[in-house]
């Protein structure tokens, strides 16, 4: 419950920032600073958008990821306001980064070997095909978002046994979705090795 409250607060804060950006007239200093950002960076170069969409396989059809009771856990349309141009009160570089981050779904990173779930949560979930099954790196913030991504992999790639799960660090959005893997992998949970960095439980 604490995790979901933190997640909800993040969305509320983001929404408030957007409303503030839309309804607040920026100072001349802010306008000039943001105009300078436009002049100093190659915004006409769209290579990063090509990179962000390369290898796209599929995403879910639903506008949000829900839990067992039907409550929304993660809204995929909450970032749709980023489709428009950055308002004068927003840093255009950060706005563009947000546009890249809102791209979601299952992606093939290395053909036949590495796949990634993006935009379903605060972090990315990566699947590496080993000789005898999947190695999963980071399992997102919630069971629901991790399961949505895991189901995409099983549907569009392959439902292999999960041999190991790796937590890269102890931020909650990198480990809290573990039940989605343990409860839905074709092999028993006790056969899945979980690996974390030294001091994981101390941070």
Language model: regions and residue ranges:
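Bacterial N-terminal signal peptides that target proteins for export
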Residues: 1-8
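Generic structural signal for hydrophobic residues
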Residues: 8-9, 149
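Bacterial N-terminal signal peptides
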Residues: 9-16
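Sec/Tat signal peptide C-region and signal peptidase I cleavage site
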Residues: 17-21
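N-terminal pre-domain segments of enzymes
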Residues: 22-99, 103
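Conserved beta-strand hairpin/beta-sheet module of binuclear metal-dependent hydrolase folds
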Residues: 99-160
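Metallo-beta-lactamase
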Residues: 108-109, 195, 199-203
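Active-site metal-binding motif and surrounding structural segment of the metallo-beta-lactamase
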Residues: 132-133, 143-196
């Amino acid at each position: 419950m604490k995790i979901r409250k933190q997640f909800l607060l993040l969305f509320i804060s983001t929404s408030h920032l957007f409303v503030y950006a839309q309804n607040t007239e920026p100072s001349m200093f802010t306008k000039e600073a943001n105009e300078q950002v436009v002049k100093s960076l190659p915004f006409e170069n769209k290579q990063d958008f090509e990179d962000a969409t390369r290898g796209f396989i599929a995403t879910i059809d639903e506008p949000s990821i829900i839990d067992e009771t039907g409550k929304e856990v993660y809204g995929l349309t909450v970032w749709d306001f980023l489709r428009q141009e950055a308002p004068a009160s927003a840093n255009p570089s950060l706005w563009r980064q947000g546009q890249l981050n809102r791209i979601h779904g299952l992606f093939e990173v290395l053909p036949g070997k590495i796949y990634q779930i993006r935009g379903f949560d605060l972090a990315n979930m990566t699947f590496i095909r080993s000789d005898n099954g999947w190695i999963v790196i980071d399992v997102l913030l919630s069971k629901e978002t991790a399961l949505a991504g895991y189901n995409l992999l099983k549907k569009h790639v392959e439902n292999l046994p999960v041999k190991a799960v790796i937590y890269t660090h102890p931020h909650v959005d990198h480990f809290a979705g573990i039940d989605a893997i343990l409860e839905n992998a074709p092999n028993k949970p006790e056969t899945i090795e979980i690996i974390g960095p030294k001091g994981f439980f101390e941070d």
